[in-house]
């Protein structure tokens, strides 16, 4: 299988393969619209949405930390000084960024 056939991120001679949404061996199906209006179906519907949003958010955080947009202690490739610290130091040094 070629590398372009898989979801991946390429940066600085490093290829990171992305995991699919379903991390388990069984494929999950998400019902985004409850068929019936009872309370249990609505709860199941909201739980499905929470799981999708939660997994997406974790993936976004990992990608942001990899590209240096935020610091993630569990990711060794993320930038050590946060990009938010750059704004604090650049004005103190007269416009020169020493980080």
From Swiss-Prot:
Disulfide bonds: none annotated. It comes from the Viruses. InterPro entries: Caulimo_AT. This protein is involved in virus transmission. Belongs to the caulimoviridae ORF II family. This is Aphid transmission protein. It comes from Cauliflower mosaic virus (strain W260).
């Amino acid at each position: 299988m070629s590398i372009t056939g898989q979801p991946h991120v390429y940066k600085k001679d490093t290829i990171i393969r992305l995991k699919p949404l379903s991390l388990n061996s069984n494929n999950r199906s998400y019902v985004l619209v409850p068929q019936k209006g009872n309370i249990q179906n609505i709860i199941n519907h909201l739980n499905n949405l929470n799981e999708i949003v939660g997994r997406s958010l974790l993936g976004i955080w990992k990608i942001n930390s990899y590209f240096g947009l935020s610091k993630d202690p569990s990711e060794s490739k993320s930038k050590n000084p946060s990009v938010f610290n750059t704004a604090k130091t650049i004005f103190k040094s007269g416009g020169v960024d020493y980080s």
